[in-house]
C-alpha cells in the first residue's frame, strides 16, 4: 500500500468521514483517494481557515473530519485555532504537507515552515511529523485517538521524506 492508502485506512478505522482541503500537489494522492472512495465526503475550500470552520461545524453536528493543507496555507490557521478550535474543544485533525525544507525555492514556504512548529507550541497544539511508512499508521491512529479523548486539535505534518515532496525543476 502507498502512504496515502495507508493514511486513508487509518482515517476509516477512526470514523473520520469528512475530508476538507485546499488543493495541493503533494496532497493529491490523499485528496483523490478520498474523492474516489464513497466512504468519504470531500469538500474543497477556498482557504484553510474556511476548511477548519467546516470541520468545526461538522464536529458539532456529530461528523468527524480532517483538514488537508500545505505549509504556506497554515499561515492563515492560527487565528481559527486560537479563537474557535481550542476554546471550543474541537478535536480538529489538520494534515499539513511540509514545504520550506530540503531544497525549497519559495521563500514564502520557507518562512511559514520556520514559524509553524513554534506557533503550534505557543498555542499548545500537539503536532507530529510523519517521516516514514513504518511509523506513520501508529502516529496517525494515536494522534486521532488522543485528539478525540482530550477534545484538542492535532497537526500531522507530512515530511517530504514520507511523501516525496514537491518536485522542483532547476532553472539555468
Q: What is each residue range found by the language model?
A:
Residues 1-172:
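Thiamine diphosphate
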Amino acid at each position: 500500500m502507498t502512504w496515502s492508502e495507508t493514511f486513508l485506512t487509518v482515517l476509516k478505522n477512526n470514523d473520520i468521514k469528512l475530508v476538507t482541503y485546499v488543493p495541493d500537489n503533494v496532497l493529491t494522492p490523499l485528496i483523490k483517494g478520498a474523492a474516489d472512495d464513497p466512504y468519504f465526503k470531500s469538500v474543497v475550500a477556498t482557504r484553510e481557515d474556511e476548511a477548519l470552520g467546516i470541520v468545526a461545524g461538522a464536529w458539532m453536528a456529530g461528523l468527524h473530519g480532517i483538514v488537508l493543507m500545505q505549509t504556506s496555507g497554515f499561515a492563515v490557521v492560527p487565528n481559527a485555532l486560537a479563537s474557535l478550535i481550542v476554546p471550543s474543544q474541537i478535536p480538529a485533525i489538520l494534515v499539513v504537507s511540509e514545504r520550506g525544507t530540503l531544497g525549497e525555492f519559495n521563500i514564502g514556504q520557507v518562512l511559514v515552515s520556520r514559524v509553524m512548529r513554534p506557533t503550534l507550541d505557543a498555542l499548545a497544539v500537539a503536532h507530529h511529523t510523519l517521516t516514514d511508512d513504518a511509523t506513520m499508521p501508529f502516529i496517525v491512529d494515536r494522534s486521532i485517538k488522543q485528539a478525540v479523548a482530550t477534545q484538542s486539535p492535532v497537526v500531522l505534518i507530512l515530511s517530504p521524506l514520507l511523501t516525496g515532496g514537491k518536485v522542483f525543476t532547476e532553472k539555468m
